[in-house]
Swiss-Prot record:
Organism whose genome encodes this protein: Rattus norvegicus (Rat)
Record gene name: Crygs
The protein's role, per its UniProt record: Crystallins are the dominant structural components of the vertebrate eye lens.
InterPro entries linked: Beta/Gamma-Crystallin (IPR050252), Beta/gamma_crystallin (IPR001064), G_crystallin-like (IPR011024)
Similarity comment text for this entry: Belongs to the beta/gamma-crystallin family.
Positions where N-acetylserine occurs in the chain: S2
GO biological process, any: morphogenesis of an epithelium
Region described as Connecting peptide: 88-93
Lineage: Eukaryota, Metazoa, Chordata, Craniata, Vertebrata
Alphabetic keyword roster: Acetylation, Eye lens protein, Repeat
Domain Beta/gamma crystallin 'Greek key': 6-44, 45-87, 94-134, 135-177
Name of the protein this chain belongs to: Gamma-crystallin S
Domain statement: Has a two-domain beta-structure, folded into four very similar Greek key motifs.
Amino acid sequence: MSKTGAKISFYEDRNFQGRRYDCDCDCVDFRSYLSRCNSIRVEGGTWAVYERPNFSGHMYILPQGEYPEYQRWMGLNDRLGSCRAVHLSSGGQYKIQIFEKGDFSGQMYETTEDCPSTMERFHLREIHSCKVLEGTWIFYELPSYHGRQYLLDKKEYRKPVDWGAASPAVQSFRRIVE
């Protein structure tokens, strides 16, 4: 295990069977080790795993735990190509400001809590910009923490492309808590 305690193991087959690839640091391309990935065991830390090499394609955030099949991490298929450890901010403080328009304009809402439905809580179907003031957060394309995921560290995001999205569709979000 790494100095930070972060460790993830990828398995070719379901239920932690078949060839295995262990990782304790960021890896831009592990396809040469595994042709497919059907199960994952996160033994330390929180990880972002990506569908393609170079941290691209669909991203999935995986906290410590066992994922015996790719549907458990809401994967679309058995293809993964890269991973990186998520570095959480220290102090356990969380605060985010979301805006209904780009460049921090329009109505602003501030929260320190998870939000399973932006429509129910803020009457928003889209978030066009945000400021992460404290903590690390995940935006989800759909309500109840489903759909494409976007990892947001402490900084300002003037438009959806700044957090890696093609559109402003964000309908739920939550803190990454270890």
